[in-house]
């Protein structure tokens, strides 16, 4: 007699095993290399500027092109992942950004480098959201928030590592060598992912793959053998309209739009600080080596904040936790501007900003994965990240604009604090929106993040 097993209930009843930790580690390494690239470009920018005798304004297209590619990659690869699978898309995207990062090292001029940074961004933008989706779909409800944020700490650690390593190695190997390093490592990882990274069992069920294939995938997670078993998902079947339209179906529209505002504002801050902080500090007379350590405090704070918020989000109302965190982040941003004459006080304020802003962004990614069902989850996460990348483009460009307008140091950071306040307000409104049971799809009952 065929037994029927609901996948999420099965995952919830089992401990987190070796197969799930393998997925977490693989995805951790992917986002770590993404973080490395994000930070490295900010630290090699002064060397590129000197190499081609550019102005600060000339660097804006370099930052903007990569972020435009990130946006396009997220928009394209979310629906592709929902159709062709998480594993294939992640592997392809990692190989893509590795290849074009390597080619960027040999760009003959700024125009070609800008073009290659756009192509690098396509791979980066497609990989990151799908790692969130993949990790989320492998985990039991009780551990999902904490473990997805743990996985995404790879981004903040990669950013901290990329900044410090770039600052130390640029005098030795130049900006070309940093881009070679940033290209070779993803290519090695892409090859390793082929045998190491399994496919999502939720995607396999939703795409109606043979039950024997699903049984092997699930058996590798639980350590059990499943003969004559039918696996199913306790969520609505995919509709005819496709995964994109489901983001805006009924009252889901309000939740999607509010999420997008938070993503836009949050990544605006993160990329503005990541791209321009070394230049801003250098402009204040701080040498690049010291600037790298001070800027690394932002990413280290983000790692600490992500781990802390992941635990708090699993225990308390996640929307309120993130709203409070963004509010505290806004206060710390203001403190950066008020501490321009005290390097250690500035580093402490930047560390606090990392906790409140970068840490919250990691938590926001984990939260978003719970708000959409399997058939539209990768699209929902990817499109939210794509909107966030639009904010990142605005942030990376606005840093140069504010410097050109000769904003004072404290005024500049007062302006940067405004998006953090907006994010906090939107999350408070999201708390009200998700109280309505008709607002959220059936992904929430099995989500690892609950309202209290």
From Swiss-Prot:
InterPro entries per UniProt: MFS, MFS_dom, MFS_trans_sf
Membrane topology: Multi-pass membrane protein
Localization: Cell inner membrane
Cell inner membrane listed as a keyword: yes
A single GO cellular-component term on record: plasma membrane
Main location: membrane
Transmembrane regions: 22-44, 59-81, 88-107, 112-134, 146-165, 175-197, 253-275, 290-312, 319-338, 342-364, 385-407, 412-434
Effect of residue 82 to A: Loss of activity
Induction behaviour: Induced by 3-hydroxybenzoate.
SUPFAM superfamilies: MFS general substrate transporter
Molecular function per GO: carboxylic acid transmembrane transporter activity
Keywords: Cell inner membrane, Cell membrane, Membrane, Transmembrane, Transmembrane helix, Transport
Family of the protein in this entry: Belongs to the major facilitator superfamily. Aromatic acid:H(+) symporter (AAHS) (TC 2.A.1.15) family.
Its job: Uptake of 3-hydroxybenzoate (3HBA).
Listed name of the protein: 3-hydroxybenzoate transporter MhbT
Species: Klebsiella oxytoca
């Amino acid at each position: 007699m065929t037994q029927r097993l609901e996948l999420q209930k099965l995952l919830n009843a089992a401990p987190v095993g070796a197969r799930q930790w393998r997925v977490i580690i693989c995805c951790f390494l992917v986002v770590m290399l993404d973080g490395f690239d994000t930070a490295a470009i900010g630290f090699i920018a002064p060397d590129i500027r000197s190499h081609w005798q550019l102005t600060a304004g000339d660097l804006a297209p370099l930052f903007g092109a990569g972020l435009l590619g990130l946006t396009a990659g997220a928009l394209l690869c979310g629906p592709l992942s929902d159709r062709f699978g998480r594993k294939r898309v992640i592997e392809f995207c990692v190989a893509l950004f590795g290849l074009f990062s390597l080619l960027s090292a040999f760009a003959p001029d700024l125009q070609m480098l800008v073009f290659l940074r756009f192509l690098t961004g396509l791979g980066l933008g497609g990989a990151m959201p799908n790692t969130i989706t993949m990790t989320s779909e492998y985990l039991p409800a009780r551990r999902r928030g904490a473990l997805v944020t743990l996985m995404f700490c790879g981004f903040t650690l990669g950013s901290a590592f990329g900044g410090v390593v770039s600052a130390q190695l640029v005098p030795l190997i130049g900006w070309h060598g940093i881009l070679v390093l940033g290209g070779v490592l993803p290519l090695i990882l892409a090859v390793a992912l082929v045998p190491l990274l399994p496919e999502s069992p939720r995607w396999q069920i939703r795409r109606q793959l043979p039950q024997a294939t699903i049984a092997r995938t699930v058996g590798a997670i639980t350590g059990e053998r499943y003969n004559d078993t039918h696996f199913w998902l306790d969520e609505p079947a995919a509709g005819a309209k496709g995964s994109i339209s489901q983001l805006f179906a009924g009252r889901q529209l309000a939740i999607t739009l509010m999420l997008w505002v938070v993503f836009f504002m949050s990544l605006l801050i993160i990329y503005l600080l990541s791209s321009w902080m070394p230049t801003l500090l250098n402009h204040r007379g701080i040498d690049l080596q010291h600037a790298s350590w001070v800027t690394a405090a932002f990413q280290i704070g983000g790692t600490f904040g992500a781990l802390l918020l992941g635990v708090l989000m699993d225990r308390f109302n996640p929307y309120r936790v993130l709203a409070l965190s963004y509010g505290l982040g806004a206060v710390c941003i203001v403190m950066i501007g008020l501490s321009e004459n005290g390097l250690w006080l500035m580093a402490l304020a930047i560390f606090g900003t990392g906790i409140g802003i970068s840490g919250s962004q990691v938590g926001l990614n984990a939260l978003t994965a719970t708000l959409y069902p399997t058939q539209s989850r990768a699209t929902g996460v990817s499109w939210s990240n794509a909107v966030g990348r639009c904010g990142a483009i605005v942030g990376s460009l606005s840093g140069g604009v504010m410097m050109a307008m000769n904003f004072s140091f404290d005024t500049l950071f007062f302006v940067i604090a405004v998006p953090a306040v907006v994010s906090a307000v939107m999350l408070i409104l999201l708390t009200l929106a998700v109280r309505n049971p008709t607002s959220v799809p059936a992904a929430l009952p099995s989500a690892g993040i609950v309202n209290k």
